[in-house]
A protein has these predicted regions:
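Intrinsically disordered, low-complexity, mixed-charge
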Residues: 1-101
């Protein structure tokens, strides 16, 4: 672990379970990601979950994962947030953060 680990660019996919559809979760997720300066995307899945990918500094991504795991949108009830495909990047692949359909 180096001094600059917090500024290392990382990418991770997520899936949020619980009462997360029909409560504007994707909109609030996009807004939060943009506040943090993250790149990536989010969408509703056919399984009733929210899925997406976030990229940014390790600190930014950890902040977003905390939001996805504990806060969410008003009216949401998060059961859990699963992460997968964590990787370090030389640079972000995404410019901005979008809602996919």
């Amino acid at each position: 672990m180096g001094v600059d680990d917090a500024h290392q660019i990382v990418s991770v996919e997520f899936e949020v379970y619980g009462h997360v559809q029909g409560v504007y979760f994707t909109k609030y997720c996009r807004d939060r990601a943009m506040e943090l300066g993250l790149g990536g995307w989010v969408k509703n899945s056919k399984r009733g979950t929210i899925v997406g990918k976030v990229q940014g500094t390790k600190d930014q991504v950890e902040n977003m994962v905390n939001w996805l795991s504990r806060t969410g949108s008003p009216g949401s009830k998060i059961e859990r947030c699963e992460l997968r495909d964590f990787e370090y990047l030389a640079r972000q692949d995404f410019r901005g953060f979008s809602i996919r359909f």
